[in-house]
């Protein structure tokens, strides 16, 4: 018995004594041979060194790089779309007078970048309605759903089986019974609370569903990164929606924890709808293992808007791309700003490039305004956000907390001329790790409308002054520094 005990003890001693060595070897192999930011590399090495077992678990949850996985290699869109893009590039390079209308003067380089990096066509015949209240947004959406004649494409990161989706679900089942093609694409992590049997039941009712990046064991979803954070609805190619609202009762102010939910969502009519349709179909093809590009009728029926037109590009980013297109648009817009920058975001964890660009803008006399929530929905991210906000406050930016519920709006307005709004937060996760989609709108009227909304929000905000920030308690400072130190792991 004692000999067996000694053998076991020797084995345990050997394992413990070599654990650090093998852990560091593992860390070098998996971290250095994947493309990532140097700060992220060192953060992972320190975590794996000091907390070997727990660090490994965290790496499984957050750390792996998916850039080179075949599962994210998405093919280019149909040839005729690429042809239109090449023609726009030629006109921009030759400074074609028709192409360079007043709205995009000064932003030709950004338009060109979006054409080259993301095949984002510039469309000029778009109507845009801006929703900042969930009840108004979903009333409009459900009315558009009831008017569908050919197809309904719905994609959300979070769909909860509650009072809101019950209303939407009834409409979808009714339209499917009328012969309308209905597709619902949802993220496995965001919708993990919904039972698989529910989606199966919807399929039986004629509503096609597909799950993005499912786990082998549904209740054991280990992949926190690389989630599909997009929120897109396309109806008959006549109207599309994109923005920050998911589907759940909290988004229509029925959750006691958050109270009023302040978000931003766009309703679009015009040729930009095609950009969102293509984006949905690319994601659907991957999740459903289907090729809807073989269905040309799904790309017909685009109609111009009927009111004041605006120029727009639909841009997207994710781990399937070699460029961080949304990040680069934010960075370029900040660098091009001459008068003012307005930012709303629930999470403010910028990389060094964007943080430095914002600080340079402040020191150059540009008015920089940043609005964040007054309450956390994810405490770790909130305290990291507050740390970076502190940098901006000390640099001279105008920073505010929204105190009338929870702020989930995501976007930026520059010089009252251009706005970039959609699903992407101002953080590392949205820039590099998740699948996102934004609309870049080159239009003074819509940009000024969004500035006016921002100014109205200020009535229920509290400004974070230098004195207020410096006087924060030691406990809060410690939280900030710990969370900021770990923020590269996001």
Regions found by a protein language model. Give the residues of each.
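N-terminal localization/anchoring segments of enzymes in phospholipid and broader phosphate metabolism
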Residues: 1-328, 332, 336, 360, ...
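Cytochrome P450 I-helix active-site segment
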Residues: 205, 367, 371-378, 385-386, ...
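Helical hairpin unit composed of two closely spaced alpha helices linked by a short loop
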Residues: 337-339, 347-369, 373, 378
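Thr-Gly-centered strand-to-loop micro-motif
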Residues: 343-345, 402, 421-422
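Histidine/acidic-residue-rich catalytic or RNA/ligand-binding cores of hydrolases
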Residues: 353-355, 382-384, 414
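Catalytic-core elements of nucleic-acid end-processing and repair enzymes
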Residues: 410
